């Protein structure tokens, strides 16, 4: 049988015979998302603005004619969760306000194609280095541009969020110690992770890493405290990748 444990030989037969020839697969295509432990992905059903989904619903390409907001399939209201987004957007110049990565409580369906309106039910880091909550901005965080990786660590137990660009957390914050995070109110509605293109005419391309399947190359290989996930940057202490086993324990 094929156990897919060796990323360099995904067609390897664990019994030692009848190996398969790998075609159009690379080490990055190995996934630890299984029937006994599902990792979070983006939700194809929430796609009013007609974004294109690929790479197992972990790569989002927005339509340049519409503003767009896409959310994840798993929602949470407690626990501490970590994920990463690589911004491949051709329009993703430094200090660009169009792109937002964060979490929301409401479906984008409630506001049609206008993702910026739906973000009033949540918060996220904009490309200009400010946290946007739909009605105002909080400065002091790090901006991001094309090919940058944004780390998002959200503490739903204490209502704090932390954002890093290429491993550097803004606002002198530290999610492991709980210092200088962005404060938000955790209510009774579940939050889902979100990527947002707030301006029509912009082209957003986002690769999302929840830990189970990689859409961009990982050079360092970091797991959470339970040994799950594969991330470019270190998972903060007591934060976890969003999968069903961790969810049953911490969510």
Predicted regions span which residues?
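PRY/SPRY (B30.2) beta-sandwich protein-interaction domains
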Residues: 1-251
């Amino acid at each position: 049988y094929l156990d897919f444990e060796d990323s360099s030989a995904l067609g390897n037969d664990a019994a030692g015979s009848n190996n398969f020839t790998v075609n159009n697969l690379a080490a990055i295509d190995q996934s630890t998302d299984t029937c006994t432990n599902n990792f979070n992905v983006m939700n194809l059903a929430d796609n009013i603005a007609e974004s294109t989904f690929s790479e197992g619903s972990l790569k989002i390409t927005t339509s340049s004619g519409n503003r767009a907001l896409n959310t994840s399939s798993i929602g949470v209201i407690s626990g501490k969760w970590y994920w990463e987004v690589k911004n491949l957007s051709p329009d993703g110049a430094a200090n660009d306000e169009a792109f937002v990565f964060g979490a929301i409580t409401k479906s984008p369906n409630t506001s049609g194609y206008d993702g910026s309106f739906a973000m009033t039910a949540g918060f996220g880091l904009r490309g200009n280095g400010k946290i946007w909550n739909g009605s105002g901005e909080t400065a002091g965080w790090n901006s991001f541009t094309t090919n940058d990786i944004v780390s998002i660590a959200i503490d739903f137990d204490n209502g704090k969020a932390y954002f890093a660009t290429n491993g550097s957390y803004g606002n002198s914050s530290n999610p492991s110690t709980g210092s200088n995070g962005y404060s938000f109110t955790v209510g009774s509605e579940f939050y889902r992770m979100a990527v947002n293109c707030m301006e029509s005419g912009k082209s957003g391309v986002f690769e999302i890493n929840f830990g189970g399947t990689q859409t961009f190359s990982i050079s360092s290989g970091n797991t959470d405290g339970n040994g799950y996930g594969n991330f470019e940057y270190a998972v903060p202490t007591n934060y976890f990748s969003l999968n069903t086993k961790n969810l049953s324990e911490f969510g």
